[in-house]
Amino acid sequence: MQRIEATLLAHDLKFALVSTRWNHLIVDRLVEGAELAFVQHGGKTENLDHFLVPGSYEVPLVARRLAETGRYDAVVCLGAVIKGDTDHYDFVAGGAANGILNTSLHTGVPVAFGVLTTDTVEQALNRAGIKAGNKGGEAVLAMIETANLLKQIER
């Protein structure tokens, strides 16, 4: 059996980041973690384009348009949806997750779900680099590996 694994090198990769303005104090940390991970793994900042959208519900449409351009090896979606007292959380979080997944499957371009879905602001901050690592950086690493694996499959 042949085992195929991808590298975590971003030297030849071009990524799009889509992040939300909503909950920007949290999301800005995710973006910083994403950029740091990309550069630490050999990516060049000029190969990382950053697009800002109002909120998580707008992320899938912009991600899909970016994926359809063919200019990007992967799209990384970053945001934070924090539960409140209404059902709004369920609709926004579920819509964003489904839209991002459908974008990846429809376009064949890897699209990362780096949208935090938490009960509290504290939980979101922890996942944005305070205590529990940085989910923005983790999303970029997953996309580096996936994009490189797809390149191997396409050879």
Curated annotation (Swiss-Prot):
The active site is at H88. Pathway: Cofactor biosynthesis; riboflavin biosynthesis; riboflavin from 2-hydroxy-3-oxobutyl phosphate and 5-amino-6-(D-ribitylamino)uracil: step 1/2. 5-amino-6-(D-ribitylamino)uracil binds at W22, S56, Y57, E58, A80, V81, I82, F113. GO terms for molecular function: 6,7-dimethyl-8-ribityllumazine synthase activity. SUPFAM superfamilies: Lumazine synthase. The keyword Transferase applies. One of its GO terms (cellular component) is cytosol. Keywords: Riboflavin biosynthesis, Transferase. GO terms for biological process: riboflavin biosynthetic process. It catalyses: (2S)-2-hydroxy-3-oxobutyl phosphate + 5-amino-6-(D-ribitylamino)uracil = 6,7-dimethyl-8-(1-D-ribityl)lumazine + phosphate + 2 H2O + H(+). Its EC number is 2.5.1.78. (2S)-2-hydroxy-3-oxobutyl phosphate binds at D85, T86, R127. Belongs to the DMRL synthase family. HAMAP family: Lumazine_synth (MF_00178). Catalyzes the formation of 6,7-dimethyl-8-ribityllumazine by condensation of 5-amino-6-(D-ribitylamino)uracil with 3,4-dihydroxy-2-butanone 4-phosphate. This is the penultimate step in the biosynthesis of riboflavin. This is 6,7-dimethyl-8-ribityllumazine synthase. It comes from Deinococcus radiodurans (strain ATCC 13939 / DSM 20539 / JCM 16871 / CCUG 27074 / LMG 4051 / NBRC 15346 / NCIMB 9279 / VKM B-1422 / R1). The gene is ribH.
